[in-house]
């Protein structure tokens, strides 16, 4: 009996493993009548089917006022305002899954190359911008909570290694300068999260998994300034962030230096084609995997094998898995990194390898 109790306690102590993806474009595909299919060609209702396949968390991005985004960005899928996000989160919760909310703090894409300040905050002083981050985060979360869709995980910023809310919050992540302003913004966002959603966990998301020195310095600077968050979130794409063993070493190092912080791969994906892809250009990684259906599958196999080695890794999320141009196109051009074939709508072989 004692042995059984010890075994039960050990099992219960294991961190929950999250599996999911950022499917922020799903309502746009639904409006077009897009049909998703399993690998045998059977039509499925996507969210309930993902739940059946073992997914338990869906990531959703939120822009401040996406109507202010350039048309080119809208053509790429920038449309997720608060009302859109609430509707999608209601679908996710109805399907029995949890929500990760991804605050971009921008009217358009926020990533390493750009962290544009929302139009309404452009003339703000650093302190006024800090106050705006707090008020906006708080108001957004209150609206989600009132709609019955409190997010279980909350990202305060998206791929913010180079800072956020440029130019005010821009920084060089290899140096200490600039982190005071960034951390002022982060603390404001995290404070709002704690107040409105005290049971939710907060993620700080960076995208330099292939560069240990920058990753180490970044999270050390946050620790030095006592930023209150729970989870280290990383992007990992093989075309930009070196090999999977390199990712594994970064995870080991983070687990050693920040043992109190679980780690999640909050974005990952790999190409299966460059067909009709206006963005690909030099995004090749033939040194690791061929750009093919089999290459995408093999990447997924090896990624999951690596992540299973690390107890401190508690989640992995595919970015834009719902891409499916088999009916009507939603974006101008195909990214070809999703988990459904753009011609047939069938689940890709990689989908069935993407599991714990």
Indicate where each model-derived feature is located.
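Bacterial Sec-dependent N-terminal signal peptides
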Residues: 1-14
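Boundary/entry segment of secreted carbohydrate-active catalytic domains
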Residues: 14-49
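Acidic-and-aromatic substrate-binding clefts and catalytic sites of carbohydrate-active enzymes
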Residues: 29-30, 34-41, 65-69, 75-83, ...
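Aromatic-rich peripheral "rim/lid" segments of glycoside hydrolase catalytic domains that contact
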Residues: 31, 253-260, 273-356
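Glycoside hydrolase catalytic-domain groove-lining segments
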Residues: 40, 44-47, 180, 191, ...
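Substrate-binding cleft and catalytic face of glycoside hydrolase catalytic domains
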Residues: 49-201, 205-209
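Structural recognition of alpha->loop->beta junctions
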Residues: 127, 134, 142-152, 222-233, ...
């Amino acid at each position: 009996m004692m042995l059984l109790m010890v075994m039960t306690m050990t099992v219960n102590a294991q961190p929950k493993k999250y599996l999911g993806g950022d499917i922020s474009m799903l309502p746009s595909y639904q409006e077009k009548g897009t049909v998703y299919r399993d690998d045998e060609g059977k039509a499925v209702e996507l969210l309930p089917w993902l739940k059946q396949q073992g997914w338990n968390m869906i990531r959703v991005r939120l822009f401040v006022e996406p109507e202010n985004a350039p048309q080119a960005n809208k053509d790429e899928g920038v449309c997720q305002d608060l009302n859109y996000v609430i509707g999608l989160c209601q679908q996710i919760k109805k399907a029995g899954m949890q929500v990760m909310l991804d605050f971009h703090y921008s009217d358009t894409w926020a990533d390493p190359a750009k962290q544009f300040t929302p139009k309404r905050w452009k003339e703000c002083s650093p302190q006024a911008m800090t106050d705006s981050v707090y008020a906006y985060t708080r108001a957004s979360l209150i609206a989600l909570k009132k709609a019955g869709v409190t997010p279980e995980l909350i990202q305060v910023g998206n791929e913010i290694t180079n800072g956020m809310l440029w130019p005010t919050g821009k920084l060089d992540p290899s140096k200490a300068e600039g982190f005071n302003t960034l951390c002022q913004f982060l603390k404001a966002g995290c404070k709002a999260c704690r107040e409105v959603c005290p049971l939710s966990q907060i993620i700080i998301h960076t995208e330099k998994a292939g560069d240990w020195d920058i990753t180490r310095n970044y999270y050390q600077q946050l620790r030095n300034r006592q930023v209150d968050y729970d989870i280290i979130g990383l992007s990992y794409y093989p075309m930009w962030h070196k090999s999977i063993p390199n990712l594994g070493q970064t995870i080991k190092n983070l687990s050693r230096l920040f043992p109190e912080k679980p780690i999640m791969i909050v974005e990952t994906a790999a190409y299966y084609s460059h067909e009709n892809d206006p963005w690909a250009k030099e995004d090749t990684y033939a040194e690791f995997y061929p750009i093919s259906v089999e290459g995408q599958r093999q990447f997924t196999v090896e990624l999951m094998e690596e992540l299973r080695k690390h107890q401190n890794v508690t989640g992995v999320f595919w970015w834009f898995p719902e891409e499916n141009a088999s009916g009507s196109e939603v974006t101008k051009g195909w990214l070809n990194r999703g988990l459904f074939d753009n011609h047939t709508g069938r689940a890709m072989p990689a989908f069935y390898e993407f599991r714990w």
